[in-house]
Amino acid sequence: MFIGIVTLFPEMFKAITEFGVTGRAVKQNLLQVRCYNPRDFTHDKHKTVDDRPYGGGPGMLMMVQPLRDAIHSAKAEAGEGVKVIYLSPQGRKLEQSGVTELAQNKKLILVCGRYEGIDERLIQTEVDEEWSIGDYVLTGGELPAMTLIDAVARFIPGVLGKQASADEDSFAAGLLDCPHYTRPEELDGLTVPPVLMSGNHEQIRKWRLTQSLERTWLRRPELLEKLALTDEQKKILNQIKSETV
């Protein structure tokens, strides 16, 4: 997968390219990450990348020419079929279903805004989609871009040891994840649920499903409204509700 990043702070993305699962994906050539700094496309000795907004007001906007040239350079390297995304508070909120959609693309370009944002005409002519990671304001698009990359990279074949890890994570099936346990068997008087050590795979599956449904109902009940539950899930959920009322 190719991901181009238009950013004034390419050094920040070492967190993606050099560490953890995404860093390993880069080393294995499963994920290619390229940064394009608008400063490298300026024409003045000061490498100016901001400009005043028409109409006045506080703050500055990213200068059109360097930003547009950086986007064009990213598009040229990516080639045909690339999707350009602008990280923006006005964008579609990133949820697991959206991550799954974005993971279907083999080429993405992420535009990271700074200052008060970018010229609306660039959004109209250069950007395919706007995405947001939440209803709050950050100082730039770099952290949202890193969040998106980390989430999407998990679906690249070979990035995770087992694809089931991505498929079974919280939200992947619309439910919160079940509790997990490892050694020791007892920790500060707390023990591992016996069913997990029983070796009975069907009982373990049912226990995990029950835990996921219970956690989702108690912590994020609105998620259940979006799901088409199976008959088994409905039965388990009704039992959970009857036992907790």
From Swiss-Prot:
Question: What reactions does this protein catalyze?
Answer: guanosine(37) in tRNA + S-adenosyl-L-methionine = N(1)-methylguanosine(37) in tRNA + S-adenosyl-L-homocysteine + H(+)
Query: Where found, per UniProt?
Result: Cytoplasm
Work out whether the entry's keyword set contains RNA-binding. Answer: no
Q: Name a single GO biological process.
A: tRNA N1-guanine methylation
Specify the domain of life of the species encoding this protein. Bacteria
Q: Which GO terms describe its cellular component?
A: cytosol
Q: Example GO molecular function term?
A: tRNA (guanine(37)-N1)-methyltransferase activity
Q: Describe the function of this protein.
A: Specifically methylates guanosine-37 in various tRNAs.
What is the designated name of this protein?
A: tRNA (guanine-N(1)-)-methyltransferase
